[in-house]
């Protein structure tokens, strides 16, 4: 509701004269629907923000922040975090993740989110909302009104797949699947003799490669993931360069011909650069806390512990010849950290 929007803007201390300007932009707004038989009659638009307006994201985030501050105002909700604090939600615009150690707490936050959202004209999409239980316990479903939320083993959030078991392989397989589909759609280009090798490689690096390694900075590294990424990468390069297995071209020679590195080496460099950003954050930022945080509740299963991103980064630091504390100090100098990562990556590529 737009009237709710102006009231919320006022609570955030935005001067009345600016609110009046915002209001004037939305006054008497109308549109029509274009069909194959012509345009419909004009009708008024009384809700929502304007599409394409540079103010729209700002106004929408004001509303989301207003809702979330009231939905999770109870400081006892959420999961135990550092310094006696609790983490109850992670938000990216309207993509919201609610976190809780108890079923009751999660149901309460969901109810509050729905209640305050409806007051300003926003409703939770029951079809798009999923639940995930971390651990072996079973709980009744979370409800939104009369609708029961489905519990899933993994779900997609901000383009990445989150697994109940905390496995990276689910996301890696999904990224490779999407990249393979993209690569296949461009096969006429790869087969064309009229397009130079350099142009094909530029297309591969600007279209297929980013699809493959999207969010790879957050992946842990295992032998299986490394092999899966490199196999896909080499298969694509052999197709682009027209190299058959009958030609007996080694992987090392293939990389020299393509003037590229193994995909895993690219992922390692991206992860190290990303880690530098995290290490530079203030101590209270959730991303900074997450790389050193250990849950106080729960019990690990018997057997070998699963590898984590933290362990992967420690291996990166060992390869870079650094300890955690010295890495945090070095990362504060952005230029110095970038040069260090580039130097280690070039040395790894030669090896």
List the predicted regions and their residue ranges.
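Short linear motifs embedded in intrinsically disordered, charge-biased segments
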Residues: 2-5, 11-19, 24, 30-53, ...
């Amino acid at each position: 509701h737009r009237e709710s929007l102006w009231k919320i803007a006022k609570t955030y201390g935005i001067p009345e004269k600016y609110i009046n300007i915002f209001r004037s932009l939305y006054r008497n707004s109308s549109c029509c629907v274009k069909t194959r038989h012509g345009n419909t009659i004009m009708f008024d638009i009384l809700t929502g923000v304007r599409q394409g307006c540079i103010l729209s994201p700002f106004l929408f985030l004001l509303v989301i922040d207003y809702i979330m501050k009231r939905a999770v105002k109870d400081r006892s909700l959420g999961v135990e975090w550092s310094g006696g604090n609790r983490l109850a939600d992670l938000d990216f615009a309207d993509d919201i993740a609610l976190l809780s150690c108890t079923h009751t707490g999660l149901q309460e936050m969901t109810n509050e989110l729905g209640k305050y959202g409806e007051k300003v004209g926003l409703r939770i999409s029951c079809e798009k909302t999923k639940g995930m239980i971390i651990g072996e316990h079973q709980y009744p479903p979370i409800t939104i009104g009369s609708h029961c939320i489905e519990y899933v083993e993994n779900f997609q959030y901000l383009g990445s797949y989150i697994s109940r078991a905390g496995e990276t392989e689910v996301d890696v397989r999904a990224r490779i699947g999407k990249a393979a589909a993209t690569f296949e759609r461009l096969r006429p280009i790869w087969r064309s003799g009229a397009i130079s090798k350099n142009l094909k490689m530029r297309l591969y690096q600007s279209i297929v490669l980013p699809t493959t390694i999207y969010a790879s900075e957050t992946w842990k590294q295992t032998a299986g993931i490394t092999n899966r990424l490199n196999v896909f990468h080499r298969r694509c390069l052999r197709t682009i360069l027209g190299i058959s297995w009958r030609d007996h071209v080694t992987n090392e020679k293939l990389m020299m011909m393509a003037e590229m590195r193994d995909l895993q080496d690219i992922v390692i460099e991206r992860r190290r650069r990303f880690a530098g950003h995290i290490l530079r954050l203030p101590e209270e930022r959730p991303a900074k806390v997450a790389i050193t945080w250990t849950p106080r509740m729960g019990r690990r299963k018997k057997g070998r512990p699963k590898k984590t991103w933290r362990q992967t980064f420690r291996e990166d630091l060992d390869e870079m010849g650094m300890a955690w504390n010295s890495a945090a100090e070095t990362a504060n100098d952005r230029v110095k950290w970038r040069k260090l990562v580039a130097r280690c990556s070039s040395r790894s590529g030669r090896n």
